[in-house]
Amino acid sequence: MMLQRADGLFTSVSRSDADVSDAKALWQDVYCGEFGWLGVGSDPRADKYHQRSLYAVCRVNGGLPVGTLRIVHEDDPGFYITEKLGTAPISRYLSKGIEVQRLMVRKEFRDRRLPEAPFGIYGVLVKVCLYHALAVGAEWVLADCHRDIDIGPLKSMKAMGFEETGHSYRDSINDEECIVLIIETKQWISNTLRNRSRFNKYLVPDDPAIRMET
């Protein structure tokens, strides 16, 4: 699936070699180089979630990757969250849910607004997540978010309607507390239609600046 934007920013969602390679580059630049959370050479292809994942990659200036997230589809052995918590605490969400992992934006683009990304690269990635949930019929979106890290989007996610499940765990990559969040897709759409904020108007899948390809 391709979300194509006219003014130099485009976002692709796939498991193509190009998207996975650019996701890997961002993992290395952000999670390894900037924060020291991953080892040199960490590769999305090397873990057990890769074969049932899609990678959203935002690119600008003819191809520079500036943001990414991974969308994992449910299957045995579950999600990263269930690896940490077990399946019992969130079992009702698993059969028709997706998990969002490894959302990151290159440092120099975190606070930038572009004509085609009025809420920044993070806003584009959130929109991708909603579009994908609707496209595949996912009823729930699971996510986790560091509670005490300044760049974490916990406040923004809760403002969109994500709710804390009451469960948390220590992230193995940095020993920080991660809060497990959940949103029902139909509730997310309802929220965006009921509360017509600028961001919600941007999120609703009725955007002439975006072309979706399958």
What are the residue ranges of the model-derived segments?
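Acyl-donor binding region in acyl/amide transferases
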Residues: 84-178
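Short amphipathic alpha-helix that is part of the acyltransferase structural core
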Residues: 1-45, 50, 55-57
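C-terminal "cap" of GNAT-fold acetyltransferases
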Residues: 172-200
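Conserved beta-strand in the GNAT
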Residues: 57, 63-73
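Short, cationic low-complexity segments
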Residues: 198-214
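Secondary-structure boundary elements
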Residues: 19, 33, 59-63, 131-140
